[in-house]
Design a protein with these regions (language model features):
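Catalytic cores of nucleotide-sugar-dependent glycosyltransferases that transfer UDP/GDP/TDP-activated
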Residues: 2, 7-476
């Protein structure tokens, strides 16, 4: 009855019997999935990678929280499934809704009004309770409708792997899921106190590793996910090497060196159909690598929209970023006066650290017509900045991969980056007509940029050289 109806609704798990040699179904768990929900790069990846895998014939379903308001972005149909989760002496119940991404990939949204009935994705300090319960609900779903692979992302869903490992590790009969964990940013680990873990039903030793413990009396959800996963991936080869060192390992470098044989650095990509200046509906004009006139119009329109001097020969530098220490925006502030003195225009869009926001706003007040600062998150303006900018600045202190440089390339904006993590893997130093960008701020400080242009043959090479998830998946 209800189970058959539910199983039929979740079409890629419609049968328990799988042909020998068939591609195993994947259950993909993420706290955010664009375009349903998005704060940063995780949402972009969760919306793009499953679509690329599905295009290659991989049966895949995404599970994500049902935040208030996502039903306004995509139609959601209620399924006859309810997941019950024990949490701190009570039972939390999750309803299940089904939607489809524009690519056709099935998304299951787990609804619990108390935990996720708000329009925000992250809500410190309640995130511990919210994502612990969501991870348990996702694990319960995997127990009811067993896939072949469960793929979790970051600490928000790593606990699902811990539950599945606990339930199935010692069973010789029945399904044994392959457990995959992708680390998008090692700095966020889901650290909480031991007492809370016990109230969830864990024994302390299940989540505690004294030799890799950063803070006494705490548990580390991401560390436990790393420990139980059959495969661990991160979003660039360089970042996979960096996180095994004390400098970038965030206290888990020893554990990651211990699991190095299971650790893979796979470079991120973007959805080149979603990010396509030839079809992007929010741009004032369209263009592609062969016909670049539209980019000139986009630059002029952006200058007008942001109150910058309308000068087609001025170098326009775009910054679309969180305002925080990791992203290196304070490093940009240290040299930005010199950059501006070279004739560079700045268009910044970002949210985060209020102090950094005030510093950039003061800069805009000092240089009207040359610096524009918009504080907040505006995905439409972000794409217009990529389309109108000549260069995009990414001065990150560390960067697991970064998508801004890839989106910039797709829209014909040359990336200027610090050589770290995925930025080092995706941006080849510009030399004559070779390379894809600059790996330091030095070029901006050494030259006058009052007469800026890129030869059209070079621009075409930049725009066509973008890493897409389809290309990355086929390569694997």
């Amino acid at each position: 009855g209800r189970e058959k109806e539910a199983r039929s609704a979740v079409n890629v798990f419609a049968t328990r019997e799988r042909r020998e040699g068939a591609i195993p179904p994947v259950l993909y768990l993420s706290a955010e999935v664009a375009p349903l929900s998005k704060v940063g790069g995780l949402g972009d990846v969760a919306g793009s990678l499953p679509a690329a895998l599905a295009a290659l014939g991989v049966p895949i379903v995404i599970i994500t929280p049902w935040y208030q308001g996502i039903e306004e972005r995509v139609p959601l149909a209620r399924l006859p499934i309810e997941l019950s989760v024990p949490l701190e002496g009570r039972v939390e119940r999750f309803r299940v809704g089904r939607a489809w991404l524009p690519s056709g990939v099935t998304v299951l949204a787990l609804a619990n009004d108390r935990l996720f009935g708000q329009p925000v994705i992250y809500d410190e300090p309640r995130d511990r309770e919210r994502f612990f319960a969501f991870s348990r609900a996702a694990a319960e779903f995997a127990r009811l409708f067993p896939p072949g692979i469960v793929h979790a992302n970051d600490w928000h869903t790593a606990l699902a792997l811990v539950w599945l490992h606990r339930w199935f590790d010692d069973r010789r009969d029945g399904p044994r899921h392959a457990l995959v964990l992708t680390i998008h940013n090692l700095a966020h680990q889901g650290i909480t106190d031991i007492g809370y873990a016990r109230r969830l039903g864990f024994e302390a030793e299940e989540l505690l590793f004294e030799e890799w413990q950063r803070y006494p009396g705490t548990i580390n959800v991401l560390a436990r996910g790393i420990h139980v996963a059959d495969a661990i991936t991160t979003v660039s080869p360089t970042y996979a090497e960096e996180i095994q060192t004390p400098e970038f390992g965030e206290g888990l470098d020893g554990l990651l060196r211990y699991r190095r044989e299971a650790l893979w650095g796979i470079r991120n990509g973007i959805d080149v159909e979603l990010y396509d200046p030839a079809t992007d509906p929010v741009l004032p004009d369209r263009y592609n690598a062969e016909h670049l006139e539209g980019k000139v119009h986009c630059k002029r329109a952006l200058q007008a929209e942001l109150g910058l001097v309308e000068d087609p020969t001025a170098l326009l530098a775009g910054v679309v970023s969180r305002l925080d220490h990791q992203k290196g925006l304070d490093l940009l502030l240290e040299v930005i006066d010199k950059v501006i003195a070279r004739g560079v225009q700045i268009a910044l869009l970002g949210a985060g650290d209020p102090e950094l926001g005030r510093a950039f706003q003061a800069l805009a007040d000092r240089f009207p017509g040359q610096v524009s600062v918009r504080l907040g998150f505006d995905p439409v303006l972000a794409r217009r900045i990529y389309a109108g900018a000549d260069v995009v600045l990414l001065p990150s202190r560390f960067e697991p991969c970064g998508l801004g440089q890839l989106i910039g390339l797709r829209y014909g904006a040359v990336p200027v980056v610090r050589r770290t993590g995925g930025l080092a893997d995706t941006v080849q130093e510009w030399e004559e007509a070779k390379g894809m960008g600059f790996c330091s701020m030095r070029p901006l400080l050494q030259h006058s940029w009052r007469r800026w242009s890129v030869p059209s043959r070079c621009m075409g090479a930049l725009m066509n050289g973008v890493y897409s998830f389809g290309r990355r998946c086929k390569a694997r």
